[in-house]
C-alpha cells in the first residue's frame, strides 16, 4: 500500500510539472531528468525502510521491569500516602506566632542601655601627669583671650580709613589746600599799621572763607 501511494504521488507531481513547464525552453527534457531522480530517491527510501524493519530484532521485556523488589505493590503505596499527611504537623496559627515573637523581643527591650561615655573635658588639675598639665589650656584663659581680641577689634572698626575721612578724592583735596596755603603765605608777614580810626579787619579772611568752601565742596564730592 505504501508503494502504491508513493507511485501515485510521483505521478501526480510529474503531471503537474509537465503542465507548468510546457512553455519553458527545454522544460520537458529537464522535467524528465528531475522525474528520474525523484523516482530513484523514493525507491531507495522505501527499500531501506523495508530492510530495516525486516532485520530489526525483537527485544524481550527487561528483567528490571519484572523485578518485584523494584516495584512494590499498590497497597504499600496507598499506605504510605495515607501515613504521610499525618506525619506532617499543621502550621501554628498566627496568634501563637505573634505571641512567641513578642516574648522573644521583650528581653531585648528590658536590657539596660549601655553607659554613655562622658565627653566633658578634664581640667588641667584633674590630669594625673604633671607634665601634661601645661598642654591643656584652661577655660578662663580662653575666655580672656577672646575678650581681648574683641576689645581690640572694636576700636579698629570705629576708626575710619584715611581715604573715607578725607573724601572721595583725598589727593585733590591735599593739592588744593597746598595751593591756597601757598597763595595766602605770599603776602607780607607783618601787616601795615592801620590808622586808629579804621576798624582792624584781617586781610586773609575772605581767602580763608573761600578755601574752606572749596575744601568742603571737594570733600563732599
Curated annotation (Swiss-Prot):
Disulfides per UniProt: none
Induction of the gene: By growth factors and cycloheximide.
Location of region: Disordered: 105-155
GO cellular component: cytoplasm; nucleoplasm; nucleus
One Pfam family hit: IER
Modified residues (N-acetylmethionine): 1
Biased composition (Low complexity): 125-136
Entry keywords, A to Z: Acetylation, Cytoplasm, Nucleus
An annotated GO BP: response to fibroblast growth factor
Subcellular location as annotated: Cytoplasm; Nucleus
Family: Belongs to the IER family.
Summary of the function given for this chain in its UniProt record: DNA-binding protein that seems to act as a transcription factor. Involved in the regulation of neuronal differentiation, acts upon JNK-signaling pathway activation and plays a role in neurite outgrowth in hippocampal cells. May mediate with FIBP FGF-signaling in the establishment of laterality in the embryo. Promotes cell motility, seems to stimulate tumor metastasis.
Name of the protein described by the UniProt record: Immediate early response gene 2 protein
Species per Swiss-Prot/TrEMBL record: Mus musculus (Mouse)
Amino acid at each position: 500500500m505504501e508503494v502504491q501511494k508513493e507511485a501515485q504521488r510521483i505521478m501526480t507531481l510529474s503531471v503537474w510539472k509537465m503542465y507548468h513547464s510546457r512553455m519553458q525552453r527545454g522544460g520537458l527534457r529537464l522535467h524528465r531528468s528531475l522525474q528520474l531522480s525523484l523516482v530513484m530517491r523514493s525507491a531507495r527510501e522505501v527499500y531501506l525502510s523495508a530492510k530495516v524493519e525486516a532485520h530489526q530484532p525483537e527485544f524481550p521485556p527487561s528483567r528490571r521491569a519484572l523485578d518485584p523488589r523494584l516495584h512494590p505493590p499498590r497497597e504499600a503505596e496507598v499506605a504510605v500516602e495515607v501515613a504521610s499527611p499525618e506525619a506532617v504537623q499543621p502550621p501554628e496559627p498566627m496568634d501563637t506566632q505573634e505571641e512567641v515573637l513578642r516574648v522573644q523581643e521583650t528581653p531585648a527591650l528590658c536590657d539596660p542601655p549601655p553607659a554613655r561615655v562622658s565627653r566633658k573635658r578634664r581640667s588641667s588639675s584633674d590630669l594625673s601627669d604633671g607634665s601634661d598639665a601645661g598642654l591643656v589650656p584652661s577655660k578662663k584663659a580662653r575666655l580672656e583671650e577672646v575678650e581681648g581680641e574683641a576689645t581690640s577689634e572694636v576700636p579698629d572698626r570705629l576708626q575710619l580709613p584715611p581715604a573715607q575721612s578725607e573724601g572721595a578724592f583725598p589727593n585733590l583735596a591735599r593739592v588744593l589746600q597746598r595751593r591756597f596755603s601757598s597763595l595766602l603765605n605770599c603776602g607780607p608777614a607783618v601787616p601795615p599799621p592801620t590808622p586808629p580810626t579804621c576798624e582792624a579787619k584781617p586781610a586773609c579772611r575772605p581767602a580763608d572763607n573761600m578755601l574752606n568752601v572749596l575744601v568742603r565742596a571737594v570733600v563732599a564730592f
